[in-house]
Amino acid sequence: MYYKFSSFTQKLAGAWASEAYTPQGLKPVSTEAPPIIFATPTKLTSSVTAYDYSGKNKVPELQKFFQKADGVPIHLKRGLPDQMLYRTTMALTLGGTIYCLIALYMASQPRNK
C-alpha cells in the first residue's frame, strides 16, 4: 500500500505507486513544442541622432600626472578635493572605531538591578 499527502483533507491517503513516487506539483514535462510567438516589430523613429559621449581618452594624461615624482602621496595628488575626502574618511573611521569601543564597553558592564 502506498500513501500520499492529500492537500484537500490534510491527511495521508491511499494512492497508487506512480502517484506516491511523483512529488506533488511535479509532473512529467510534455514533449509538445509551444507555439512560436513572433513579437510585433517596433517602429523606429527617423530622427535618430548619434552622440559621442565617450569624449577624449584621458588615461595617458592621468598616468603621467599620477606617476610624477613630486613627493606627494598618491591619494592627495589632485589637491583640495582629495584632502577633504581623505580627512573625512579618516574622521569617520576614527569616530566609528571609538563608537564601537564605547558600545562594547557598555555591553560588557553588568546592569544594576
UniProtKB/Swiss-Prot annotation:
CDD domains listed in its UniProt record: Cyt_c_Oxidase_VIIa (cd00928)
Mode of membrane association: Single-pass membrane protein
Effect of a null allele: Knockout homozygous mice manifest decreased mitochondrial respiratory activities and impaired formation of mitochondrial supercomplexes in muscles. Mice display muscle weakness and exhibit heat production failure in the cold.
Record carries keyword Phosphoprotein: no
A GO cellular component entry from the record: mitochondrion
One Pfam assignment: COX7a
InterPro entries, sorted: COX7a, Cyt_c_oxidase_su7a-rel_mt, Cyt_c_oxidase_su7a_sf, Cytc_oxidase_su7a_met
Transit peptide location on this chain: 1-54
GO biological process: mitochondrial electron transport, cytochrome c to oxygen; mitochondrial respirasome assembly; regulation of oxidative phosphorylation
Chain segments annotated as transmembrane: 81-106
Family (UniProt): Belongs to the cytochrome c oxidase VIIa family.
Its job: Assembly factor that mediates the formation of some mitochondrial respiratory supercomplexes (respirasomes), thereby promoting oxidative phosphorylation and energy metabolism. Acts as a molecular adapter that associates with both mitochondrial respiratory complexes III (CIII) and IV (CIV), promoting their association. Mediates the formation of various mitochondrial respiratory supercomplexes, such as MCIII(2)IV(2), composed of two CIII and two CIV, and the CS-respirasome (MCI(1)III(2)IV(2)), composed of one CI, two CIII and two CIV.
Protein name according to UniProt: Cytochrome c oxidase subunit 7A2-like, mitochondrial
UniProt lineage: Eukaryota, Metazoa, Chordata, Craniata, Vertebrata
